[in-house]
Amino acid sequence: MSKLFWAMLSFITRLPVPRRWSQGLDFEHYSRGIITFPLIGLLLGAISGLVFMVLQAWCGAPLAALFSVLVLVLMTGGFHLDGLADTCDGVFSARSRDRMLEIMRDSRLGTHGGLALIFVVLAKILVLSELALRGEPILASLAAACAVSRGTAALLMYRHRYAREEGLGNVFIGKIDGRQTCVTLGLAAIFAAVLLPGMHGVAAMVVTMVAIFILGQLLKRTLGGQTGDTLGAAIELGELVFLLALL
């Protein structure tokens, strides 16, 4: 289990992980690491939340929110934001399914992708600022949001097909079973309930699950399946939806 955690941490983040900690784990077995996604999200959110807490007293909530979101982006290397941008460029191109997938592979940033990045990043900053002004616990909120968003991404992997012939997303999409999905969602729910008691966190997770499930069905109908880019988009949108649900 420890090898899986370190392998997943180095796979979906840019945090430094010694190679020997995950050595010997075959890439084809990475799908088993889905159950570590909520824990990795918890770690990322906690670090981002700590940055917010340290900076809030010095420069106020808006700037603290800006830097906490920036730290979150840096820790993931913009991996999920890139998926969001590519997904929006493809889906909103109003082309054929094959052409959409080609556009999503293009490394150039299009208008729709750029607008999506601006909207999501700005929305996160504004929502975090508002939550802070309302006296909500930002560290707990961010940790729960990142854990839940990565946990609910399993909804786009379970019983979905991969829309392309090959790619990184193929490691997870269609490769996880019902037990892994339930464990992943269960861990995310536990983190949300513990960090944000009074059913506040669980209610926000339910809203997030519904949103991500609907997103998955829409993408399935549009693209014929899921890709690594759509998983990244789901994680980014999941974070935002969860935080919005806390308002």
Swiss-Prot record:
Biochemical pathway: Cofactor biosynthesis; adenosylcobalamin biosynthesis; adenosylcobalamin from cob(II)yrinate a,c-diamide: step 7/7
Top EC class of this enzyme: transferase
Coiled-coil spans in chain: none
UniProt entry keywords in alphabetical sequence: Cell inner membrane, Cell membrane, Cobalamin biosynthesis, Magnesium, Membrane, Transferase, Transmembrane, Transmembrane helix
Entry EC number(s): 2.7.8.26
Cofactor(s), names only, from the UniProt record: Mg(2+)
Cellular compartments annotated: Cell inner membrane
Entry keyword annotation includes Endoplasmic reticulum: no
Pfam families for the chain: CobS
GO BP terms in the entry: cobalamin biosynthetic process
Chain ranges passing through the membrane: 34-54, 59-79, 113-133, 138-158, 194-214
Catalytic activity from the UniProt record: alpha-ribazole + adenosylcob(III)inamide-GDP = adenosylcob(III)alamin + GMP + H(+); alpha-ribazole 5'-phosphate + adenosylcob(III)inamide-GDP = adenosylcob(III)alamin 5'-phosphate + GMP + H(+)
Keyword Mitochondrion included in the entry's annotation: no
Membrane topology term: Multi-pass membrane protein
Single Gene Ontology MF annotation: adenosylcobinamide-GDP ribazoletransferase activity
GO cellular component: plasma membrane
Function: Joins adenosylcobinamide-GDP and alpha-ribazole to generate adenosylcobalamin (Ado-cobalamin). Also synthesizes adenosylcobalamin 5'-phosphate from adenosylcobinamide-GDP and alpha-ribazole 5'-phosphate.
Family membership: Belongs to the CobS family.
Name used for this protein in its record: Adenosylcobinamide-GDP ribazoletransferase
Species of origin: Escherichia coli O157:H7
